[in-house]
């Protein structure tokens, strides 16, 4: 299976897997659910250039991040739904 290497200040995020949701005895279809805004970074670019110097990304592979509701580009890779987003669209890193 091919892998994705994001360029520049982009990262590949695997959105948090939301389990099937029920309200009473009614199953809520995927189309009616809110998109998750939390996920795990599975690949990261090298960083961005500012004034001719490479500035490395603050997030790293393995970080759990929060991102904007409409951030990034959705893709499918190996049967998984993934998101490619810019580091600037990441709102924060979840820590335990």
From Swiss-Prot:
The keyword Cytoplasm applies. GO terms for molecular function: ATP binding; metal ion binding; protein folding chaperone; protein-folding chaperone binding; unfolded protein binding. It is found in: Cytoplasm. SMART domains: Cpn10. SUPFAM superfamilies: GroES-like (SSF50129). GO terms for cellular component: cytoplasm. Keywords: Chaperone, Cytoplasm. The keyword Kinase does not apply. Signal peptide: none annotated. It comes from the Bacteria. One of its GO terms (biological process) is chaperone cofactor-dependent protein refolding. Belongs to the GroES chaperonin family. Heptamer of 7 subunits arranged in a ring. Interacts with the chaperonin GroEL. Together with the chaperonin GroEL, plays an essential role in assisting protein folding. The GroEL-GroES system forms a nano-cage that allows encapsulation of the non-native substrate proteins and provides a physical environment optimized to promote and accelerate protein folding. GroES binds to the apical surface of the GroEL ring, thereby capping the opening of the GroEL channel. This is Co-chaperonin GroES. The lineage of its organism: Bacteria, Pseudomonadati, Spirochaetota, Spirochaetia, Leptospirales.
């Amino acid at each position: 299976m091919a892998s994705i290497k994001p360029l520049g200040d982009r990262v590949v995020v695997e959105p948090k897997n939301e389990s099937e949701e029920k309200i009473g005895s009614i199953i809520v279809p995927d189309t009616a659910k809110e998109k998750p805004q939390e996920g795990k970074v599975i690949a990261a670019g090298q960083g961005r250039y500012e004034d001719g110097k490479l500035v490395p990304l603050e997030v790293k592979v393995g970080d759990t991040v929060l991102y904007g509701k409409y951030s990034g580009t959705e893709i499918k890779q190996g049967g998984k739904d993934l998101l490619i987003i810019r580091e600037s669209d990441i709102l924060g890193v979840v820590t335990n």
